[in-house]
Amino acid sequence: VNPIRRVWWIIIPAVVVIIIALLSAQTVSQYYVRSRLDPAVELQKAIDNMAGQSSYRFSLHSGFTVDERREVISSVEGEKEMGNTHIKGEMVNTPVDLYYLDQTIYNYDSFSKKWLVIDSGTTSSEDLLISELNPLSNFRFQTIDAVEKVQFEEIDGADCLLVKCHPTVESQLMESLWKDFEYLIWIDYKHSTIPKAHLTAANKSSNNTTLEITVGFSDFGKKMEIKAPTLSSNSN
């Protein structure tokens, strides 16, 4: 047998064994880390960290189901940096392109093809009670009942802990209209962020009406320049 070939016969199995050993060690390490995660602790850490994020991009899709008939409330994508927000998409079957900067709302009117400028009279987008402008408002809880670990899933390349809980929400508007809130929250436990969440709730006056909101978050802490639109320009 060729000596070089003999050497390769020795090297290749050895390399395979090393690779298998490394993969096994990685799997064992991941299993160990996962097994030590407390879902309630990880959820609170992620909520606190999300509240302190200076910037992020997001998507929000909301709707309700009445007797198995699906109605869309909104489908928007947006970005936030400090107190400034920009969203674009559709709300109640109407195109929306909206900025909130320095207490001023810039809303593109698709009918007149003009930007409308409105003094909101508020110091924060949170005061506008529009979930699409402040998606984190959906994660303000008064109390959280038992947090259940569901499984692990990969979201955008991140290993995420999926948890389920039934909190009491802080939003008086939400509480006045809906009940039996159930949240599914994907936690990137390595960075204490929430890349995805889904909530459902039942209507207080109609048991056959269910609310659903799905939110996605990304690009945490990235620099974004959200500037007022040029009023003579069209919506981009």
Residue ranges and their predicted role:
Residues N2-N84, K222-N236:
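N-terminal leader/targeting segments and the immediate start of mature chains
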Residues S35, Y108-E175:
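Flexible, processing/modification-adjacent segments and terminal tails
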Residues E42-Q44, A146-Q151, E182:
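Short structured motifs
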Residues A51-R57, V76-I87, L98-I105, A158, ...:
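Short, solvent-exposed coil/turn segments at beta-strand boundaries
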Residues L60-F64, G89-V92, D109-F111, H198-N203:
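Beta-turn initiation residues at beta-strand->coil junctions
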Residues V66-R70, M91-D97, S205-N207:
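Solvent-exposed loop/turn segments connecting transmembrane beta-strands
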Residues S75-E132:
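An acidic-aromatic
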Residues D156-N234:
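Gly/Pro-enriched, hydrophobic low-complexity segments
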